[in-house]
């Protein structure tokens, strides 16, 4: 009998990553990846509007001074929390990130690490797959509560309590 680790299988079982699957990361590893990046970018999706998630997201953004892309309808929630962001659709930002000549959100050059939180799983999976195959100049990190096999690195599948502890460890140094 084969036993699968339910923490590292895609949250949506039909998402098949192929031979290259995400590395499972801890909050400490995620933090190290962000610190090591020269031009990281945070992409915040609509699932991050939930109050508890938004509070952690804002603290992470401030802690690392991350430029932010607000997808879907998160722009207002981030603005009300005092976070400056650029509104882009998830498909639009994915296409911009694939272009090595794009100068990035702050005009300082292409981003080398993109951190995703709160994006709807099925659309994030497609964007991550596109970046994996067509943007080798970018690393991707998902700090969602679901494992994203198409990212370069991802948190495991977990419940909210564990996820909030993971997120808190990222800014509570």
Swiss-Prot record:
Domain of life from the UniProt record: Archaea
**Any one of the GO BP annotations:** methanogenesis, from acetate
Which portions of this protein are annotated as coiled-coil regions?
none
| Annotated pathway | One-carbon metabolism; methanogenesis from acetate
Signal sequence, renumbered to the chain: none
State how it assembles: Heterotetramer of two alpha and two epsilon subunits. The ACDS complex is made up of alpha, epsilon, beta, gamma and delta subunits with a probable stoichiometry of (alpha(2)epsilon(2))(4)-beta(8)-(gamma(1)delta(1))(8).
Q: So what does this one do?
A: Part of a complex that catalyzes the reversible cleavage of acetyl-CoA, allowing growth on acetate as sole source of carbon and energy. The alpha-epsilon subcomponent functions as a carbon monoxide dehydrogenase. The precise role of the epsilon subunit is unclear; it may have a stabilizing role within the alpha(2)epsilon(2) component and/or be involved in electron transfer to FAD during a potential FAD-mediated CO oxidation.
- HAMAP family reported in the protein's UniProt record: CdhB
Per the record, the similarity remark reads:
Belongs to the CdhB family.
Record-given protein name? Acetyl-CoA decarbonylase/synthase complex subunit epsilon
